[in-house]
UniProtKB/Swiss-Prot annotation:
Lyase found in the keyword field: yes
Function, in words: Catalyzes two reactions in de novo purine nucleotide biosynthesis. Catalyzes the breakdown of 5-aminoimidazole- (N-succinylocarboxamide) ribotide (SAICAR or 2-[5-amino-1-(5-phospho-beta-D-ribosyl)imidazole-4-carboxamido]succinate) to 5-aminoimidazole-4-carboxamide ribotide (AICAR or 5-amino-1-(5-phospho-beta-D-ribosyl)imidazole-4-carboxamide) and fumarate, and of adenylosuccinate (ADS or N(6)-(1,2-dicarboxyethyl)-AMP) to adenosine monophosphate (AMP) and fumarate.
Known EC number: 4.3.2.2
This protein's name: Adenylosuccinate lyase
Binding site for N(6)-(1,2-dicarboxyethyl)-AMP: 4-5, 67-69, 93-94, 212, 263, 268-270, 276, 307-311
Coiled-coil zones: none
UniProt-listed Pfam families: ADSL_C (PF10397), Lyase_1 (PF00206)
Subunit structure: Homotetramer. Residues from neighboring subunits contribute catalytic and substrate-binding residues to each active site.
Taxonomy of the source species: Bacteria, Pseudomonadati, Campylobacterota, Epsilonproteobacteria, Campylobacterales
Domain of life, source organism: Bacteria
Gene Ontology annotations for the cellular component aspect, listed alphabetically: cytosol
Catalysed conversion reaction: N(6)-(1,2-dicarboxyethyl)-AMP = fumarate + AMP; (2S)-2-[5-amino-1-(5-phospho-beta-D-ribosyl)imidazole-4-carboxamido]succinate = 5-amino-1-(5-phospho-beta-D-ribosyl)imidazole-4-carboxamide + fumarate
Family statement: Belongs to the lyase 1 family. Adenylosuccinate lyase subfamily.
Length: 440
């Protein structure tokens, strides 16, 4: 975890102090459950719940000998207690404490992620509504296609982000599960009721079945969902980067007073935040492979997953949280240039209206093949003009004039019918209906 890419609230969940505090929370829940079952007296339960404490430095000192951080933790806590310490960590195994504590930490962390996703969705929705009718050129393969609106672009992003909210709700069900089932998961030394009570105290569900650990397909699902979320965020960031290119310049990241873009070129205003998001998304996705490989543990458990999770889980949550907040800020403060969008629309010389013309000809009796051939032939002439450097002066009249001078078209379409094809409103007439689908 790098401080540079971490928000305080999420970072606070993934440090040694919080980890052992959560271990202690789980252990106290187990003690309370034993007490509820009549196995630990009220006085001992009360003493443990009130007095149990730990010291990080002492845990580290003990671990030098034990080579086992959970035993170092339980030993340290026992030192803070009296005779009642014999009931601390009673009848359970290390993974009962560790995995159940991890469920608590992941649940809290995922709630922060869900909050970030909701914020991003709302920001995209608001900016989409703001630019519902802002005309721009749509691009496929990076090449001009047909007129669209910038609002449609943002609405598409918003709808995709909303899907992640549904996926994360399901993932929350998978990860908010505890297990207090003993060394082999067979409840030999602790009844099922102990697990149900302890997990209930902690606000967790119980796994239907476990061995020594909670099964890692749950963790892998989480990693994959965060990777998918990152890919969607990267898609947004990459599109912003393209739209900010000097020759496009339809949007721009906010550039604050005193900000610098280059140590060598004073004129530079770069999409550095979107580039940063792109890089963070690569980091997030990089954890999917080791988390998937953690699913296949030996028999009732081996420890190969542990080192992976010590790296992956904190970084997955912290980086995803930061990515969301940064992207939300980029969208919220994004500067949009509608005039440049209109200028770029005109740069096609009117080619963006080619399909409209194509679809009018068959209505007049011409075959689709002949229609396509005539329209494409005229379009290729415009490309030849544009190849000669006429982009800077291009407007809709280039293609329109070519069509108006084509004797073959005149047999099927009169001048007013041809001119009617060059109408931006034709391409935006359903935007309102689309928005109603997306946003209700």
């Amino acid at each position: 975890m790098l401080e540079r890419y971490a928000n305080e609230e999420m970072k606070a969940l993934w440090n040694e102090q919080t980890k052992f505090e959560t271990y202690l929370e789980v252990e106290k829940a187990v003690v309370r459950a034993w007490n509820k079952l009549g196995q630990i007296q009220d006085s001992d339960c009360e003493k443990i719940c009130l007095k149990a404490a730990f010291n990080l430095e002492r845990i580290k000192e003990i671990e030098k000998t034990t080579k086992h951080d959970l035993i170092a933790f339980t030993t340290c806590v026992a030192e803070s207690l009296g005779e009642e310490s014999r009931f601390f960590h009673y009848g359970i195994t290390s993974s009962d404490c560790i995995d159940t504590a991890m469920a608590l930490l992941m649940t809290k962390s995922l709630k922060l992620i869900q909050k970030g996703v909701k914020n991003l969705y709302e920001t995209l929705k608001n900016r989409a509504l703001e630019h519902q009718d802002t005309l721009m050129v749509g691009r496929s393969h990076g090449v001009f296609g047909e007129p669209i609106t910038f609002g449609l672009v943002l609405a598409l992003f918003a709808d995709e982000i909303k899907r992640h909210l549904k996926a994360l709700d399901l993932t929350m069900e998978f990860i908010s599960v505890g297990a207090i089932s003993g060394a082999m998961g067979n409840f030999a030394h602790a009844p099922l009721e102990l697990e149900e009570l302890a997990c209930g105290f902690l606000g967790l569900k119980t796994a239907n079945i476990s061995n020594q650990v909670i099964q890692r397909d749950r963790y892998a699902r989480l990693a994959c969902d965060l990777a998918l979320l990152a890919s969607s965020c990267e898609k947004i960031a990459v599109n912003i980067r393209h739209l900010q290119r000097s020759e496009v310049y339809e949007v721009e990241e906010a550039f604050s007073a005193g900000q610098k873009g280059s140590s060598a070129m004073p004129h530079k205003r770069n999409p550095i935040l979107s580039e940063n998001i792109t890089g963070l998304c690569r980091v997030i996705r990089s954890f999917t492979t080791p988390m998937l490989e953690n699913v296949a543990l030996w028999h009732e458990r081996d420890m190969s997953h542990s080192s992976v999770e010590r790296f992956a889980l904190p970084d997955l949550f912290i980086t995803s949280d930061f990515m969301l907040s940064r992207l939300n800020s980029v969208i919220e403060n994004l500067v949009v240039y509608p005039k440049n969008m209109l200028k770029n629309l005109a740069l096609s010389g009117g080619l963006v209206f080619s399909q409209r013309v194509l679809l009018e000809l068959p209505k007049k009796g011409l075959s689709r093949e002949e229609s396509y051939s005539i329209v494409q032939e005229n379009a290729m002439k415009i490309w030849e003009v544009l190849q000669q450097g006429a982009f800077k002066n291009a407007d809709e009249n280039l293609f329109l004039n070519a069509l108006l001078n084509d004797e073959r078209l005149k047999k099927y379409l009169n001048e007013s019918e041809i001119r009617a094809c060059f109408d931006y409103s034709y391409y935006t007439k359903n935007v309102g209906a689309i928005f109603k689908r997306v946003f209700g």
